[in-house]
Amino acid sequence: VNIFVTDPCPRKSAQVLPDKHVVKMPLETCQMLSIVFSHWYYDWGDDLLKKKDGTPYKTSKGAFRNHPCTQWAAKSLYNTAWLIQHGCALSTEYTHRYGKEHGCRDTLWQAKKVFHRFSEKAITCYNYVEDYAFAGPDQFKYDTSIDTLTAYKRYISSKPWAASNYLRDPSRKPDWL
């Protein structure tokens, strides 16, 4: 589970991720949001987000609840809004690259509705996010000369497969890779 924040704008951050991340990150986003909405954090409900088959994501054991990215998402409504927008952007990016809807698309849009209903805030409040969590290797995590966005860019760049993982739309490959 990770978020890979490469830009303060959740849409731009999603657009520059490699194909591999665009495929797997929407599901991880749904899992994190289910925990954030549940009794582990906001206590809005344990079965608010449903999978494509209609069953809710399991929250009883609190998988991922102690992960730095989940904790970050639950730290403020602004962070939660950012993650929701990023998840929706990942879903849109998936459709752009693969020509079909991601299996988590409806759940991510459902998360946006849940957020509006329970927080009474506009989803655009993500603009007030002040920091981001980094979950990655120590060489990037403890480098005080760089910010979290740069740490994620360097982390992604360190993967030998990343530079060639823009097969669906090579124009999405960022200059920093």
What spans do the regions from the language model cover?
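Sequence termini and other peripheral, non-core segments
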Residues: 1-66, 70-177
